[in-house]
Amino acid sequence: LFQNLVKSIYFRLFGFVFFVSVSFLMAEPNALEDIGEGKRLQSENNCRKAIQFYQSALQKNRNSIDAKLGVADCSFKLGAFRESKKFYLEILDREPKHIPAVTGLSGIYLLDSDFNAIAKLIDPLLIEYPNHTALRITEAKSLQKQGKLDSAIYKIKTLGTKLEEPPDLLRMLAELYFTKQNFNDSYNSIDSYTKKEPNDPEGFAFKAKVLLYQNYFHPNQLKSVLPIVEETLQNSLNLDPKGEMARFYSVYHDIILSNFTSNKEMKRRAFRTIYELAREFPDNQLYHSLEANLAWELGETKFATYHYRRALQLDDLDELLRFEAEEYSIASEKEESKLRRELGDYRRDRFYSEKYSFYHKSSLFHLKRAKDLSPQTPVIRKELLEFYNQTGEAVKYTNLLLRLREEDPNSFKLQNKLEFSIKNLKESIEFREGYLQIDPNLIQENTVRFSPEVYVFDLESSLPFPYHLQAGRLLGEAIRYNLKQIQSVRVIDGNEFNQIRGLLKESSFHPFSQTLPFAIDDLHLLDTKRRNAVKIRYIVHGKYQIKDGDIRVDVSLYDRDSLRDIATWSTNQRGRDSLPTVIHRIGERIREILPKEGKILKIKKDEVIVSLGKDDGLKKDSKLEFQRKGNTLFQGVITELGKSISSVKPNVRGWEKELATGDDVILPTDSGKEKKGK
């Protein structure tokens, strides 16, 4: 009986082992088939399907290194970095020297700039395999992100020479040169790469990218290489019709060609391509912002509205994009629209946050933008009323009270404020001299300003292909917007500004950003419509760079009389409210630099009325100079200081015979310094 029992157990155990062995042998070929199919799909950049086959292979053979590597690589490409890291670590637990897993895991550490972790992975292997191209490329990528480009280039070039320039090293070298903005060497490297690897679609896409960047600052050369760029992109798309890089740079190509040829259909083609990319990659903010911009230009308002909202949801710290969305919304949407209302609410909230902060002056930018976006909002009106009252903007204060009274005619509080404000206006020098007209429902200012005139050019990007297509124009518009709030500066705007832009565009414009660059040879175009009138004297121009959320602007103020830049300075700010802060600093600096100048409006018995006042920075004890054709005649003291005009008594006898209406009046520089010192 015992022997029979032992035999029975033996046969059962043998059967189980035989079954497991057969199952394993049958499963292994099936797993290999899945891995093979996964690799094929992965080579076609179809990681979403490839990963399913790798996972299927793991179910059949959970120890398969190839299947785990496939899941890790595809997860990385799809942005599932935690899953990718898990499988790379599982591979390295079994095979610590598995180089594809080492380089893959290093790529994840690179995302977090964990350079020490990368060094721990690759340094021991580099000692053992100093000529391994994948390890050297991983090392170069780490050095590249650390900003050690020269070291990375040296190591890749040295190894490339030793190994007779293998394709993967040429590709890496092209990227390193590109990062260093050495576009000539980058092009030579990628050109050599595409000759050795003619079936790599990304190689051709990168080659087209380098060609565009190489010629960005030379519009004529950029135009001449467009056919080569198109051919190179087509080579890439023939190899991989869904290639992301090639499709994206075809958008840039079509935008440039459209602007060169004024071909709207070409821009519509760019719009259709970016439309597809934005849907395939819904978390890519650049795609959404670019689609919104093109939609605005093409009149596709539904698309523009949706994609501005989506882009701001992805990054609400993007100050340039927010300003662009506001410009679009003010121009194209009704006040009650969802986007415009959201933008107005944001500016209102930022104003409240900054109102009593260190940056309280730049907070006024938020208030003014909130007014433009939501002029009928009660809380905005309340804040504007308080602001006008505090800053002495009596006319704006009274006009806002008049509008509020129309809406609430029975409010005694409003009526009392209105009566008191009108009483003060009637006591002002502006009213007595006839420069204020008080009607039942409106106060009109008739003061003529003679303060310095300023034309603001678009700012030029310091880097090729700025992230924001309109950034240069937007920064110029933001500077103009802020300067218009400064009474002592007259900004060229409206019809005259548009006429000048039209003339400048005929002379020169950038075919990608459509910015109009500052050029001394074109400045005569500023006065074309003025004929014998006073010429525009001051020009604001400069460059900008937006990198990692930091807005940096290099500004120059050009004086056409002295034919030189009279001031050049830089300013930068990072993060939320960076745009208002930078723009406020620029405006204040321009206000300080420009002379305080006006003219004699009236000559009276004992005094003269001049077009300078508190708005121009004058104080009661300021001394003014009278000039004619640049020659100083004599000085005068202020007897009554108004908001926009003042009464001045010249300090010499017989002045009545010397002065005439239209003579220049300036606040001397010494007086300004003295005043500042006090």
For the regions a protein language model found, what residue spans apply to each?
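Canonical tetratricopeptide repeat
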Residues: 70, 104, 138, 172, ...
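Pro/Ala/Gly-rich low-complexity, hydrophilic intrinsically disordered segments
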Residues: 222, 226, 249, 267-269, ...
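Amphipathic beta-strand/beta-sheet edge segments enriched in Tyr/Trp
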Residues: 521, 528-575, 641-642
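Register position in tetratricopeptide repeats
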Residues: 43-44, 77-78, 107, 111-112, ...
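Short beta-strand->alpha-helix linker/helix-N-cap micro-motif
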Residues: 449-521, 540, 603
